[in-house]
């Protein structure tokens, strides 16, 4: 139920390591604000969707995808709790999100990554994403994949 999602996400992000928060939000946040949580809960299910992954009844990963109005491009941001990394959860979640985006006719799926987030970049490469510099910012890369023509 959506009324349960706010507290669930708040508890999840309280268990996410500081480096993983930095990689997810591309900033030096130490915690996730109520406004950020609200944006993850109050999705429109048309241009934005938040996918949740559970293990043994606990939330262990979340993946937010947001598309432009034309559904030409969508951006995805995923975070997996540290104690559940290296189990294929991020890989599976990204694959599921890519299939969802493809089913909506979205042509390109992208993610902006911190250049040091090599684990995420490697997962994205494994799933056929290409990596390019992000504008003039040497600390970031854009990872993208064409889903349909």
Across the structure, where does each feature detected by a protein language model lie?
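Conserved acetyl-CoA-binding loop-helix of GNAT-fold acetyltransferases
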Residues: 80, 86-103, 118, 122-126
């Amino acid at each position: 139920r959506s009324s349960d999602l706010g507290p669930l996400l708040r508890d999840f992000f309280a268990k996410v390591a500081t480096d993983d928060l930095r990689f997810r939000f591309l900033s030096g946040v130490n915690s996730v604000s109520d406004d950020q949580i609200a944006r993850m809960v109050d999705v429109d299910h048309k241009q934005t969707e938040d996918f949740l992954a559970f293990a043994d009844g606990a939330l262990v990963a979340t993946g937010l995808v947001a598309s432009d109005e034309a559904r030409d491009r969508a951006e995805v941001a995923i975070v997996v709790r540290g104690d559940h990394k290296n189990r294929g959860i991020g890989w599976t979640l990204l694959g599921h999100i890519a299939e969802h985006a493809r089913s909506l006719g979205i042509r390109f799926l992208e993610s902006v990554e911190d250049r040091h987030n090599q684990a995420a970049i490697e997962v994205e490469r494994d799933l056929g994403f290409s990596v390019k510099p992000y504008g003039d910012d040497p600390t970031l890369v854009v990872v993208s994949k064409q889903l349909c023509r």
